């Protein structure tokens, strides 16, 4: 913990009073427990749900914390590259049932995925569908794509304008060099995926010269 529990509570109380969405950089199981305790001291779960509090990373989320996190409307914003941990950390994650990503979705917690570093989203898709630290918590390719798109839009209160291709939504899209949802495509081949055409706001931002 970089902050004391009283400091965490004070920061959350200030955010709660303003009606601001809190974004908390959380790693480790003890840290998340402290955040949830502070949230409980500040306001009711119903009031917190309206703010969609974001937990960035949150790899310390334990299976027995899922129901509590859902009650407060936690949005988990995870970076699959963090699943590639040194063996000592991987053993700890497995022993303490941390990083229950599949269970997070089953438990009704909103999930958004981002790349952090390295920035390649398809490398991160590979990590998410075949996580070394918790292979039992692998996501499907469709779940990963949904978390990257509509999940990320929900995390920033913009789910009615982006996150999917639909009338009235931003015309942001990409034509890819291969079908990332095809299970016949090996997971190891995903990082080589490239954009042949990228459209942002209806305008072409990138086109492969050969496309």
Located regions from the model:
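His/Asp/Glu-enriched, well-ordered alpha-helical/loop segment
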Residues: 13-24, 30-53, 57-58, 63-67, ...
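Structural alpha-helical segments in enzyme catalytic/regulatory domains
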Residues: 71-73
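Residue-level structural signal for beta-strand termini and adjacent loop
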Residues: 210-211
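Active-site gating/metal-coordination segments in enzymes
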Residues: 1-10, 58
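Residues that cap or delimit alpha-helices
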Residues: 4, 184-189
């Amino acid at each position: 913990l970089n902050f004391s529990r009283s400091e965490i509570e004070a920061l959350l109380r200030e955010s709660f009073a303003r009606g601001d969405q809190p974004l908390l950089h959380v790693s480790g199981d003890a840290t998340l427990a402290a955040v949830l305790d502070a949230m409980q001291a500040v306001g009711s779960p119903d009031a917190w749900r309206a703010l969609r509090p974001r937990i960035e990373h949150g790899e310390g989320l334990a299976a027995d914390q899922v129901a509590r996190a859902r009650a407060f409307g936690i949005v988990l914003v995870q970076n699959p590259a963090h699943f590639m941990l040194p063996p000592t950390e991987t053993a700890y994650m497995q022993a303490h049932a941390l990083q229950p990503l599949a269970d997070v979705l089953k438990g009704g917690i909103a999930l958004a995925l981002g790349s952090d570093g390295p920035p390649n989203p398809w490398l991160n898709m590979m990590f998410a569908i075949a996580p070394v630290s918790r292979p039992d918590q692998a996501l499907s390719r469709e779940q990963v794509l949904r978390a990257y798109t509509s999940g990320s839009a929900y995390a920033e209160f913009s789910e009615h304008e982006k996150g999917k291709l639909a009338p009235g939504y931003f015309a942001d899209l990409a034509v890819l060099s291969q079908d990332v949802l095809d299970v016949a495509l090996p997971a190891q081949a995903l990082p080589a995926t490239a954009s042949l055409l990228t459209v942002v706001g209806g305008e072409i931002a990138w086109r492969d010269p050969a496309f």
